[in-house]
């Protein structure tokens, strides 16, 4: 039997949207799949037109509301990444994937797709789009660290006292900026995995950082199967008294997606061993 994805690929004239892989991907309970792309590298008009054909009417309307073309472009590539990758896990053609939202607006696959055990999360900034796929709650964040703003002032307003103190102890601006984005991406990944907004209170939880350096996902050496394994860096979350969560229920790791693009993943563990994170660059075209 020819899979829906294979039929779609044939109809598109054999165009490749992500690297050639088995027609159906499975993410195990102890595994997180991480996909990333630089939207600036995707410029072929025919490919952009094909990706636009995947968008729902609601997505096309959202895309049209961006004032600048570069932001419309980044949105298109990010949605193309989501639809192209998730089609490989669900067996559903990219344009036929349907989404719903949780109580706080987190996108989820629609129940009628029969993929209740599949979770995903997207993060994008100018220059990077990142998608994680897992079997339980998962969140990812990537930031462009060159953006303006005083990290210490932002941290003083939003972060826990322990994190503010740790930033104050650092000797130079570069170190403080790096540490700020480490904290910020970990916090964002956690609240996205929880499916809630910043109303959770970024000062209600903080992180003890691991001793390991963050892996540069963009510099990884893929194995014969095309995946690179990302080493866990050992971050631990701490909660304010009375906060309704348990530190041991969560796995965290920090990483980068090339110079100037720090990131982090948060995933629910539910008593299981720490998951394996494997990464792959998603090639469109």
Where are the regions that the model predicts?
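Core catalytic alpha/beta fold that binds nucleotide/phospho-ligands
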Residues: 2-285
